[in-house]
Amino acid sequence: MEILVFMDSYGLSTQLSMETLHGSLTDPAISSMNLLNELIDEYPVAISMAAGRPYEEFFDVRLIHEYIDAYCDHLRHDRKLAEAVVTRTLFQYGTTKGIIADLIARNLAEDENIDAAAESVVVTVGAQEAMFLILRTLRADERDVLLAPAPTYVGLTGAALLTDTPVWPVQSTANGVDPEDLVLQLKRADEQGKRVRACYVTPNFANPTGTSMDLPARHRLLEVAEANGILLLEDNAYGLFGSERLPSLKSLDRSGNVVYIGSFAKTGMPGARVGYVVADQRVAGGGLLADQLSKLKGMLTVNTSPIAQAVIAGKLLLNDFSLTKANAREIAIYQRNLQLTLSELERTLGGLPEVGWNTPTGGFFVTVTVPFVVDDELLAHAARDHGVLFTPMHHFYGGKDGFNQLRLSISLLTPELIKEGVTRLAALITARLRWPRA
């Protein structure tokens, strides 16, 4: 056990060890992304099909100024604010719930057919803060557990670890989270004296699998939630990026079971770090759930940067509150990249019956299945000897499953890099298939 000894200003020693720090720091989910970053730094010429970052070609610093100017004009002309108030809005601390909740509500009505009152919106520092606030609020005592599909987004797993919230897995299928297994897990929790507070779900092009739920499955999931009195935490980061649009759970919800988590990282600007949560549920004696989330946010980040909010607001204002309109070029590129990735997988690996992959109709991710172990050792070998990076799927299972799958991200690369990246991946897989079986 390594112990670090520090001397404080009084000459007293302070001993620190991992055993005396929060247990989440040694969990594989917390450290999984560090490995990818280390490999990217160590092998800079390797083509990364690991990072789920948005396309960069259209980034332009001038847009930041245009967006802020548009928001300031909105404050002056639409809201009739004096110049001193406009200046204060950007430079001072802002309200905890955010300064653009009304504009987000208009965007939700325009793009998602969601009727959200501004007071039910809390603007957060990315969707990650929204997840933390929700789980911290719902985790009241040792009985409380969260359900989530297996595999699931590591950010959700991380938020659960930081809030000491146990996560119970729900089976996933090619049609997304399985509502019938959700029923079984609810029954199991009841038998064990546990209280399921919510089920996390990404109905559209889930990270990491790329799968989506069809319309009947969405209705069934809402039925299960209503019948059992649980919340559904709907994460819709990739909903715009498909060949067809299905209604969000929130737009279908008639019983108040859906808490909607949104992010502008993929549709607005990742560097702004602006997300939000729509929590319009009533809390007995406490107003809206959004009000309770706001209390915690006030002690965590105080408020989301008003300047960052102004950037996002300007983009909404200049695109008639439609991120579908604002992302028309990006949507086309992601569709192109996805179809190219699938066709390249077929070209390079289609003759190998033991290798397969799913065929999402949108989003950023494709899942490849192979008949051998995909672990961090193989990832390092791929970077070093084949010049390609991917994400081993076991990271999204907490290291407990998924050892024969990998995730490819199609969002950031050019067509040329996709072709070369898949070619390198195919060379790795073909070579690995020749290794002697254990």
Curated annotation (Swiss-Prot):
EC number(s) from the headed UniProt entry: 2.6.1.103
Signal peptide region: none
Cofactor: pyridoxal 5'-phosphate
GO BP field: alpha-amino acid metabolic process; vancomycin biosynthetic process
Key words, A-Z: Aminotransferase, Antibiotic biosynthesis, Pyridoxal phosphate, Transferase
MF terms in GO: pyridoxal phosphate binding; transaminase activity
Biological pathway: Antibiotic biosynthesis; vancomycin biosynthesis
Catalysis: reaction(s): (S)-3,5-dihydroxyphenylglycine + 2-oxoglutarate = 2-(3,5-dihydroxyphenyl)-2-oxoacetate + L-glutamate
Disulfide bonds: none
InterPro entries: Aminotransferase_I/II_large, Class-I_PLP-dep_aminotransf, PyrdxlP-dep_Trfase, PyrdxlP-dep_Trfase_major, PyrdxlP-dep_Trfase_small
Modification sites for N6-(pyridoxal phosphate)lysine: K266
Protein's UniProt keywords contain Transferase: yes
This protein's record includes keyword Transferase: yes
Cross-referenced Gene3D superfamilies: Aspartate Aminotransferase, domain 1, Type I PLP-dependent aspartate aminotransferase-like (Major domain)
Family indicated by similarity: Belongs to the class-I pyridoxal-phosphate-dependent aminotransferase family.
The protein's role, per its UniProt record: Catalyzes the transamination of p-hydroxybenzoylformate to L-p-hydroxyphenylglycine as part of the biosynthesis of the (S)-3,5-dihydroxyphenylglycine constituent of the glycopeptide antibiotic chloroeremomycin, a member of the vancomycin group of antibiotics.
Protein name (database record): (S)-3,5-dihydroxyphenylglycine transaminase
